[in-house]
């Protein structure tokens, strides 16, 4: 009988990262998905990255994940979002050729060491003594394993809505999974419903682009992966149009036919990626909403109209689309729809993504209440790493709010839970100036090397980059001019008679890399080198980063301050009954986690610390 150390159920963005990470750690891994086309399928928009999301992709890449490298084999429109603002909120993004993305992902996974792929459907999980034992396929055959990672996306009791029409499906033309939903309910997991949606797809050959605005990509695409030197995929343009008052009138007149507004849908949709119906209702004073016309491939005429996700009936969808400039004669290739699905309250999992109820069972992706490819992939890689480390009886791998966006996301989910699809934003991170897309590898790759999840190829690239940073830093500390000479170049510095190095000059608010190259022409060769920009950012924001590091040190000290499992909060008289009940319910394992529970006051935290010092004066927990 076949037996695996780790089985991953689901071949979406969470599943492929989980399976690959597990396999990289040397344990036998099986990835089960319905069909080959499902591997890395982009169910909704054909793009990777964005504000905060791009940082997640860079972090996945830093841990030797697949997403960054694969998008570099398929990216057809690269754009750095928010580049006119500070580097903490820069958002690398790339439009993808769907076919190229799936092709690259398939080629990688089907040749991955320690990884097998099975095309089939899992109906049940065999559990013995509150521990996973095997998966059960729809033909009743069993495959034993030590660990299971569920990455089911929108397939758990999935239900598509188009107007009043309901179609049981995990996505278009694919069956939902009822068996696994039943299993999770039987075990006693807290399950609820969420909703997401997608816009209609349209034929680009029938668009009048003269009525739209051109949206070019960056002149020089910046790769996501440290393994990619240059993006060799041809680059194309996107276009922008907008809704009109006529569009809005049609939607308002037909709101009662929308599955979302008729009461037909129970699940809560994503707050920050609303349907067009939701936009018209929530932002009723706006006269127009932008629509991004995004090509789905180099040799594919399908266009993804980003911004008009809808669950309106077929006839209404056709009607409203034709009121949009440039789309008056457009042909609809596929209708938009909403989809409802089951998810599990993420407070049912620990920060390793292992469930608290069942040993050896891990959740990653939309099953935990998140939305987005990048959020799913970030969870997948952590679940895969921890499942494999558990098989090897090694310490678990935990990212924190202080070192990664992935850590912020997991901490938010496991501490607060979510009642709506969770999306990553830069504003969710207290330390976003330190957790930038450009330094993801410097933050995380060494951690990955320490646990053995990083390939030799990436290890060499990382080591070389680290050496190059030190060499460049040394050079920038060597190149200098006197303040008087700099003044003659119209560079405003205090005339104290000292020499100013390039790194000193970078700290001047108005001074930039282009000026440095003008003064020191030898830096021109490094202009396209990410290292020069990295050091520029580090120097420019040095004082802020120093203060933020102090905050991080305080955070880490609180995270290290453990709370015993058997603590009785009702024996701490100086905190209110409400707070005692909250702490007893959440069961935080550290002072840091306790502080982040909504409603827990600073005074209560002080009381807990004093209580622990008094009761456990010898530093031991009983």
Swiss-Prot record:
InterPro entries, A to Z: FAD/NAD-bd_sf (IPR036188), GIDA_C_N (IPR049312), MnmG (IPR004416), MnmG-rel (IPR002218), MnmG-rel_CS (IPR020595), MnmG_C (IPR026904), MnmG_C_subdom (IPR047001), MnmG_C_subdom_sf (IPR044920)
UniProt keyword Transcription regulation, yes or no: no
List, in alphabetical order, the GO biological process terms annotated in this UniProt record: tRNA methylation; tRNA wobble uridine modification
Q: Where does FAD bind?
A: 10-15, 122, 177, 366
Question: Can you say where in the cell this protein is located?
Answer: Cytoplasm
Alphabetized Pfam families for the sequence: GIDA, GIDA_C_1st, SAM_GIDA_C
Q: The organism sits in which domain of life? A: Bacteria
Q: What is its main location?
A: cytoplasm
GO molecular-function terms, A-Z:
flavin adenine dinucleotide binding
Q: Which HAMAP family match?
A: MnmG_GidA (MF_00129)
Subunit-level organization: Homodimer. Heterotetramer of two MnmE and two MnmG subunits.
The record, for NCBIfam families, names: mnmG_gidA
- Which protein is depicted? tRNA uridine 5-carboxymethylaminomethyl modification enzyme MnmG
Q: Which organism is it from?
A: Rickettsia akari (strain Hartford)
